[in-house]
């Protein structure tokens, strides 16, 4: 079936992520719907064969088999060639952070050659006239031609022209990951991707258009008929806080700006059309994350982490973040407690009874037990538990879902039967198998409007225009990042750093396990470097290099590969921070934590997202003694009851 559906298809990839649903909405493509003769365009940074396999995904099985097939002719346009299997693949490697310039030039080519689908633009979009005036240079005197883009992105003008015509001549599908939105001006990539798809006119057709959500949880698989599982109430009964506080409080801040918040209480910033004033954070309770792996500029974070009076981390292992905490609450792993989960957040193909395999080890407790005890100390245990224990909550989630399913004509087994069997599977609705993203919108945009102010695809946004942001104009625009290969600083820091996901981890999870032994070089996180660059630096695979940015330095094991641009390196995200001098700002990280290197500025005033992929570094051979990796060794602690 895969061969039949994918014959003569092509995969065009650029690198990206969805950021602003107010402009165009996001969606998931069912891989079964990709039609014969289509160009399936993946605007990447979420490689399905890397990220979906971590979910045990049916989509991964389809994709890996599909990419191994001889039929698709795939064109990937991104700085690093990740796990691509098709022997007919073509790789185009733009400079990191320049995808917008390349796509704008493709738009220029379509417009100047008369290939734009005018009827689609007229019927389904707003603001094209203002955008195309910018593209043609009528607003700033600079025509955004393929030759113009070549000087920025490093891709030949003829290749840009060819890509534009390939996309237009056959039905094209552009797939977007969640990667290069993590860059300065990151919103522009996906906005421009949608504009390009609109110019081609394939949106809403089977196998055509765009989509963004393929990075996990069965993205690309058809959705079942089952309802989603609920969760513990965010707004406790009898209480006035909870969800309402989170939604309305002026103390809510963009997560990526928390370091700035800690360092600058009282500072006012722009965020998504509003002004936000940072609160004075005096206590931090961090659960379910690892900021010393995920937050940019680790040395800046060390300074910020010292500002609150108390920091508490609740986790299952001694992460880098737990090592910086004043108090650590040891939580159970999923093997030591009960729970319930769905099979695929997108596809929801079934529920699994997560039954306890072993008793809680040592002094650990379940998250529910920890929060219940904290609630008891604070005087609202009854409001938190609502009279239920853990199994009571699981039963409530399941039985509420069963009631909703019954309304929709789907009978589920009793909770007792479900728990004894361990799982329940749901049929996939036939309409879901035939689902065509934005097909209803294409058939009738008046009856089926988008969730934008105009109800259409907003190539130009009046709302964003009203914000008057200097870093996020009202239509897709090429803007130079602070750090990139075209900046003056690249003379001293000549390599662009990419922080892609590792195939051996899930974010920073599993870094302390045997899985990472397959990836590490001399116990260090690897740095991918091109053979030409390695030769100039006197490096070979198996060496250790010191990688330095304006913010810090980290050691990394060298892997020489031609799957990267000569002016670009990759250190995968998630290596645990292991400093030479623990707790000291500016200490050399000896393990390869890439966020020691990255810059901590907002992607723009619109989203205030992180910019992990907008960093320049320099590299030198490391011949000194290698310090042991202490990130995976239990630190010295004091018991709270001693």
Regions found by a protein language model. Give the residues of each.
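SH3/SH3-like (including bacterial SH3b) beta-barrel domains
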Residues: 33-45
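Flexible glycine/proline-rich, aromatic-decorated loop/lid segments
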Residues: 80-83, 319-354
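Extended redox/cofactor-interaction regions of prokaryotic respiratory oxidoreductases
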Residues: 100-104, 197-323, 333-340, 421-537
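Long, contiguous, secondary-structure-rich segments that constitute the structural scaffold
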Residues: 361, 367-421, 508, 514-528, ...
